């Protein structure tokens, strides 16, 4: 009995030792799995998963074995790259065959152009955007015009327009206001006369005679005027146009020049006259009187 009990103890010890020494327990297995996972996830210059360096560390190989494993890995990579290049070449040849098969005659290509893809589509879109935006961009001359030059040009243009507007307004004023002031030497009061009521110089001279005959008589000496009242009423102011009488009719134009009435046609006279004056013939220059007499003789 004693020997049997000792043999049973040895068997149980062997089993316990075998289970502890020969086969690893669950706790040790779990620890090994964690270490492998950490080695797999650690950062390195190689591919994820540990690579040949992790395998060399686990197996305890020497440097020669690691170099041989690296060479083998490089050979595997070369085989893979050659296989990839071979697959790429077969794919390219297959795509070229399809393109040649789908390619038709030039008429069909013109009738059905291939759709633009990739860079061609992007280039066409950019060209379309450029064509649509180009008309909206302002055209700038060279050299550029400075601001003060533009202001000078606009101001000069505005001044010219203003001058033209003033001339047009003056012409309209002449047409709309035909009443002209008329003054006579020796008579302090002036009168106004409507030139549109006349159509010749003779009618104008008769109207001037009627306007100033009574006023001129009132300016004389009262005693002389009372003694010869009836005779003065019959005396008319004659020689206004040719300078042969006591008074001569002269007009002033818009330029400030004094001209004898009757030297220009009637229409020009009406458009250029600014003021009429009845001046004494003795105060006028001899050249004006001579030109007036020559004009009268030519008309006769």
From Swiss-Prot:
One of the record's GO cellular component terms: nucleus
Tissue expression summary: Expressed at low levels in roots and shoots.
Domain of life, per lineage = Eukaryota
One Pfam family this sequence matches: AUX_IAA
Q: Which SUPFAM superfamilies match?
A: CAD & PB1 domains (SSF54277)
What is known about its subunit structure? Homodimers and heterodimers.
Which function does this protein serve? Aux/IAA proteins are short-lived transcriptional factors that function as repressors of early auxin response genes at low auxin concentrations.
Protein family (similarity comment) = Belongs to the Aux/IAA family.
Q: What is this protein called?
A: Auxin-responsive protein IAA7
Species assigned in the record: Oryza sativa subsp. japonica (Rice)
């Amino acid at each position: 009995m004693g020997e049997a009990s000792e043999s049973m103890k040895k068997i149980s010890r062997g089993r316990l030792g075998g289970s502890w020494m020969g086969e690893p327990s669950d706790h040790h297995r779990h620890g090994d799995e964690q270490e492998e996972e950490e080695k797999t996830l650690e950062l390195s210059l190689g591919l994820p998963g540990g690579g040949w360096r992790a395998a060399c560390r686990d197996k305890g190989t020497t440097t020669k074995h690691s170099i041989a494993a690296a060479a083998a890995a490089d050979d595997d990579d070369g085989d893979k790259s050659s296989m990839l290049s071979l697959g790429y070449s077969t794919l390219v040849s297959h795509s070229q065959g399809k393109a040649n098969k789908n390619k038709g005659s030039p008429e069909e290509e013109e009738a059905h152009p291939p759709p633009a893809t990739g860079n061609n589509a992007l280039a066409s879109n950019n060209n379309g955007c450029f064509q649509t935006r180009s008309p909206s961009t302002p055209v700038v001359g060279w050299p550029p015009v400075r601001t003060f030059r533009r202001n000078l040009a606009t101001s000069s243009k505005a001044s010219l327009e203003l001058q033209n507007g003033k001339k047009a307004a003056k012409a309209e004023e002449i047409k709309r206001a035909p009443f002209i002031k008329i003054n006579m030497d020796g008579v302090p009061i002036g009168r106004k006369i409507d030139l549109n009521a006349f159509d010749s110089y003779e009618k104008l001279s008769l109207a001037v005679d009627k306007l100033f005959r009574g006023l001129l008589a009132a300016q004389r000496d009262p005693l002389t005027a009372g003694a010869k009242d009836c005779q003065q009423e019959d005396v008319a102011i004659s020689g206004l146009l040719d300078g042969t009488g006591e008074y001569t009719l002269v007009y002033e134009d818009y330029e400030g020049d004094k001209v004898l009435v009757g030297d220009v046609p009637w229409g020009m006279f009406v458009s250029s006259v600014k003021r009429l004056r009845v001046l004494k013939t003795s105060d006028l220059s001899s050249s004006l009187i001579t030109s007036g007499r020559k004009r009268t003789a030519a008309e006769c």
